[in-house]
From Swiss-Prot:
Functional summary from the UniProt entry: Involved in formation and maintenance of cell shape.
Coiled coil (UniProt feature): 74-117
Signal sequence bounds: none
Transmembrane annotation, as ranges: 18-38
Keywords, ordered alphabetically: Cell inner membrane, Cell membrane, Cell shape, Coiled coil, Membrane, Transmembrane, Transmembrane helix
GO cellular component assignments: Gram-negative-bacterium-type cell wall; plasma membrane
Intracellular or extracellular location(s): Cell inner membrane
Protein name (record): Cell shape-determining protein MreC
């Protein structure tokens, strides 16, 4: 079959060759122009650049915008990664800070309670909190010291900072501590600097109220509350806490002891009062009955 010379590919193939050849010659000419070191050629190159480059500025603007967007995205990615890394480091630092504070508090308590048990010459005995034996209606804790360590009912307990409660129930190796927040707790206290006497009564709340204040107007929130020593219940001047006003407008005490972290308690040895064996000089002695011999001599 004879080929049809009127087909389009018979004309496009020579045209394609001509265009490719012309493009090669153009590129070769540009290369030669850029490589020739001559003043005239240099002027021609400068004129060509001044003519062509400004006309391509509109074409370079989108490319510049795209390049700027890519650079901004890369910068945002780097900032986001740095932010995430800083957040992780901040969380780790917070955890380390909390652990350091707990260790610092525990170390301070251990340093304050380092005189551990069983020497009768000590003024206090240190015990470890075994368990929280309290309930919604009874707030108390158990200690690992008891009668074998000389512990007795009624002795005050502290956590190294403030008063915690009193001993109520002593076994051979353990003892129970009734907390100041228990409803059965009644502690005579003094509010400083006014010197007002009051009774700290537990009501199962974290901040027990002050009762029987003579002059409540003299008491201000933030005043220091210590034991008064009245009645020989507790030694005087033991730190209890600070005065605070509750939501019910009653004067309450924000306890100094950290009830949320009771690990070690210091049991204060109270000095017993000497029993009174004679009436003393303030009470007159009854008159002695007359001797029988003296009575008979008078009759004779």
């Amino acid at each position: 079959m004879a080929r049809d010379r009127t087909r389009p590919e018979d004309f496009t193939r020579p045209l394609r060759r001509i265009l490719v050849g012309g493009l090669v010659l153009l590129l070769l000419g540009i290369f030669l122009i850029w490589r020739i070191d001559s003043p005239r050629v240099e002027q021609f190159r400068a004129a060509l650049i001044d003519r062509v480059v400004p006309s391509f500025e509109w074409l370079m603007t989108p490319m510049t915008k795209v390049a700027g967007m890519v650079e901004n995205f890369q910068s945002y990615t780097r900032i986001y990664e740095q932010n995430q890394e800083l957040r992780r480091e901040l969380q780790q630092m917070k955890a380390w800070k909390e652990a350091a504070l707990q260790l610092e508090q525990k170390n301070a308590r251990l340093l304050d309670l380092n005189q551990v048990r069983l020497d009768p010459k000590l003024t206090h005995v240190t015990g470890v909190v075994l368990a929280d034996s309290g309930s919604p209606f009874r707030q108390s804790v158990l200690l690992n010291v008891g009668a074998r360590d000389g512990i007795r009912d009624g002795w005050a307990t502290m956590d190294g900072i403030g008063l915690v409660g009193r001993i109520s129930g002593v076994g051979r190796t353990t003892s129970r501590v009734i907390l100041l927040t228990d409803t059965s707790s009644r502690i005579p206290v003094t509010v400083q600097p006014s010197g007002q006497r009051a009774l700290l009564t537990g009501d199962n709340s974290p901040s027990p109220p002050l009762e029987f204040l003579d002059k409540p107007d003299l008491v201000r929130p933030g005043d220091r509350v210590v034991t008064s020593g009245d009645g020989g219940v507790f030694p005087a001047d033991l730190l209890v806490g600070q005065v605070a006003q509750g939501p019910d407008r009653r004067l309450r005490v924000r306890l100094a002891a950290d009830y949320g972290r009771l690990e070690f308690l210091r049991v204060l040895r109270s000095h017993e009062l000497e029993p009174i064996s004679d009436p003393g000089k303030l009470v007159a002695e009854p008159p002695a009955p007359p001797a029988p011999a003296a009575v008979e001599g008078a009759d004779g």
